[in-house]
């Protein structure tokens, strides 16, 4: 099933209604919960979190660092979902995200892999249906495509 940019945006935004950012306990827990899920289900990727390579979900839950990091990742997801219909702004945000992450020397394949992780998190909390998952993966495909173009144009490793 092919979806329009507007349909993708609407479905992604809807999937985030229960995953709002914010300073309330629930808002903080939403973001921290992503990293609890991440550290439990993708332990091999902990290497990208200097000083937290051996963290468990319980360590993450008690970590102010991941309270803040969780807010950043959720905010980023809200932003890309909400600007998806504005293709130039979406692409600019993708490029800016790459620029901020250059120092971590991430495997370029991880940009698409993120959306598998993120949709897995949403599914694990009951916040995602099949249509919304398809929308996130479609958004992720476009996100990744712009990532790879920008990585290539920046003379950085990219997925061919």
UniProtKB/Swiss-Prot annotation:
Q: Which residues bind heme?
A: 101
Q: Matching InterPro entries, A to Z? A: Globin, Globin-like_sf, Globin/Proto, Globin_nematode, Mb-like_M
* Heme in keyword set: yes
Q: Which GO terms describe its cellular component?
A: cytoplasm
CDD domains from the xrefs? Mb-like (cd01040)
- Keyword line: Cytoplasm, Heme, Iron, Metal-binding, Oxygen transport, Transport
What is the annotated localization of this protein?
Answer: Cytoplasm
Molecular function via GO: heme binding; iron ion binding; oxygen binding; oxygen carrier activity
**Signal peptide stretch:** none
In this protein, which residues make up the domain named Globin? 2-152
Q: Pfam family example for this protein?
A: Globin
Record-linked PROSITE patterns = GLOBIN
Xref: Gene3D superfamilies: Globins
Q: Which family does it belong to?
A: Belongs to the globin family.
What function does the entry list? May be a globin and may play a role in oxygen transport.
Q: What is this protein called?
A: Globin-like protein
The gene name on file is glb-1
């Amino acid at each position: 099933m092919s979806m329009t940019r507007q349909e993708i945006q609407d479905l992604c935004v809807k999937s985030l209604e229960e995953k709002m950012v914010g300073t309330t306990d629930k808002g903080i827990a939403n973001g921290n919960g992503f990293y609890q899920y991440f550290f439990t289900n993708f332990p091999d990727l902990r290497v990208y979190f200097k000083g937290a390579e051996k963290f468990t979900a319980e360590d993450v839950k008690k970590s102010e660092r991941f309270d803040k990091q969780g807010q950043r990742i959720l905010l980023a997801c809200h932003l890309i979902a909400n600007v998806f219909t504005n293709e130039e702004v979406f692409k600019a945000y993708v490029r800016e995200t790459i620029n901020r992450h250059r120092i971590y020397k991430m495997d370029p394949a991880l940009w698409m892999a993120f959306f598998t992780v993120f949709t897995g998190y949403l599914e694990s909390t009951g916040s995602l249906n099949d249509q919304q998952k398809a929308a996130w993966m479609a958004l992720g495909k476009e996100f990744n495509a712009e990532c790879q173009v920008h990585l290539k144009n920046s003379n950085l490793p990219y997925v061919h």
